[in-house]
Amino acid sequence: MMLRFRSFSTTTHLLRGQNLTEKIVQKYAVGLQPSSKKVYSGDYVTIKPAHCMSHDNSWPVATKFMNLGASKVKDNRQIVCTLDHDVQNKSEQNLTKYTNIEKFAKSQGIDFYPAGRGIGHQIMIEEGYAFPLNLTVASDSHSNTYGGIGALGTPIVRTDAASIWATGQTWWQIPPVAKVELIGQLPKGVTGKDIIVALCGIFNNDEVLNHAIEFVGDDAISKLPIDYRLTIANMTTEWGALSGLFPVDETLVEFYQNRLKKLNKPDHPRINNQTIDQLINNKLTSDNDAVYAKHLQIDLSSLSPYISGPNSVKISNSLYDLSQQNIAINKAYLVSCTNSRLSDIQAAADIIKGHKVNPNVEFYVAAASSLVQKDAEQSGAWQTILDAGAKPLPAGCGPCIGLGTGLLKDGEVGISATNRNFKGRMGSKDALAYLASPEVVAASAVLGKIGGPEELNGEPVKQAPRIIKSIETESNSANEAESTSEEASGSIDILPGFPQSIEGELILCNADNINTDGIYPGKYTYQDDITKEQMAKVCMENYDSQFYSKTKPGDIIISGYNFGTGSSREQAATCILARGMKLIVAGSFGNIFSRNSINNALLTLEIPDLINKLRQQYEGNDELTIRTGWFLKWDVTKAQVTVVDGDDNLILTQKVGELGTNLQDIIVKGGLEGWVKSELKTNQ
């Protein structure tokens, strides 16, 4: 069983309010016991999201859906299919996949958007599927984008999507929520892209890893255009967060009023006078006594244009610093769901007008959607960019995901308005990729080097001021909330077949970022005939070849931070189960690994204090796998963990997130697929 519980939160938080993330989840949580129960960070909930989007991966989701025994989607109004990733690929194989997706969607009555209509996330916003204060998910990591319009958007994996198709529901553990406060006024020439690139670079020690983010600061945010907010929310994914939520304010309401006028469809099913009136009259805000895991602050007035890279979002430098280095570029890109909306294209056109793309540079442009391109054509911005020498691509992901025309080759340098510059992401692993705003990308395309718009007029880039920032963690209010809830905590109901407690000796794997290949070597991933016993023997093999001989069934692995980072292979969870281990503890877990855990019924706990104590205990010990002689007991009925040493001396007592009976049911059924099959059978 793999189920993940974070220790940052409490269980029966009867005496405090909710933050905005918790309030939105409350609206979409089902099966709460009692129905009036409030939900908080750390709690597992069953959610029925407003909408669920899948893109080119819709066919694998459909295949999984059918393999579950499902034949009809639960609610075809909940599901959206878009084709956006590999739209330049005209191979028979890809066209067949696209045809299969379209046929399936139409047979189910699902809203379907074909290749060329645009990037799924942009469509979700244009067509109102992602709407302020709703919960919208997608089988894509950039679902965070929806936070820019005040929707709680978060990614899911394919099994989750298949579950939603079949039952309308999946599970979510509410993450710790980080408050990111924006103060000050953004200087002229500084954009939303500069804000998020700076945040990724200055808070680059996983401060918000696997957190939900709420952006606050009414004065500063009110002056940020919605397109800036969408860019910022989009790249909270690269910052490590699971969502990036902006508040509902007058700027957002005005955005939707203008959108309604542009649609010219009074009876639009999602964006209409009624939904906008509801938005105005029913604004949700965080309670004054809501608890946040962290409070980060950045003064926007101290920002200047910033650039990410090369090849890492954790590296950011001011435009001033990089412009001094005369870094020649080969390719420039104005594409993606991050920065290819109308305002982005217009901004690039304003910079490039009257200039020509440098003869040593290839400049590629693709609109975020066909509607955006149409608007850009009507405004003249699209033609301005093409007249300068840019090469148009169809509306879609393209180079951002490393597909189609214009990829980086060995030794090349590219600057892009996209969201990811991981090595090899946009082409060759031997290329260098930088991320910047549309304005800087356009200027660089003309200059032939990384540079700013002012250089086109013969002026130097202004020197960057020092960024003013701060961070607070584990506030007193959070600690007080935990102690209060401890006193108020009652007994949690336990379903037949689910253990009331789990206990075992802690086995220390003292490393951070143990990836899925370290847990389950890739060379075994596609050996479909491998037995459970063989899986057990190779569990953690690439991390420590002696792991099997040092461990036994019933042990509990405890590891460092970001355990399970890497690929989406489910065997990283199932091989641990094969070793006879029901629970893993870590400082934190990779998000995909976490979802695969629950979906395969393995339990996990995030307890940073415990791994830190063990690291102090075994400082200087270089063994990879250590039997600690410390024993953990997790009392599920009280949502409490106790750790003692071999002499029964108390090491730690800590509250963890509550596991309700709805999530217990998933575990008892052997994971999410087993639960879905049971639901389908019950409802036949």
Curated annotation (Swiss-Prot):
It is an enzyme of class 4 (lyase). Binds 1 [4Fe-4S] cluster per subunit. It comes from the Eukaryota. Keywords: Amino-acid biosynthesis, Iron, Iron-sulfur, Lyase, Lysine biosynthesis, Metal-binding, Mitochondrion, Transit peptide. This is Homoaconitase, mitochondrial. Its cofactor is [4Fe-4S] cluster. PROSITE patterns: ACONITASE_1, ACONITASE_2. Catalyzes the reversible hydration of cis-homoaconitate to (2R,3S)-homoisocitrate, a step in the alpha-aminoadipate pathway for lysine biosynthesis. It catalyses: (2R,3S)-homoisocitrate = cis-homoaconitate + H2O. It comes from Candida albicans (strain SC5314 / ATCC MYA-2876). Its EC number is 4.2.1.36. It holds the Pfam family Aconitase. Belongs to the aconitase/IPM isomerase family. Its main location: mitochondrion. Pathway: Amino-acid biosynthesis; L-lysine biosynthesis via AAA pathway; L-alpha-aminoadipate from 2-oxoglutarate: step 3/5. It is found in: Mitochondrion. GO terms for molecular function: 4 iron, 4 sulfur cluster binding; homoaconitate hydratase activity; metal ion binding. [4Fe-4S] cluster binds at residues 337, 397, 400. One of its GO terms (cellular component) is mitochondrial matrix. The gene is LYS4. One of its GO terms (biological process) is lysine biosynthetic process via aminoadipic acid.
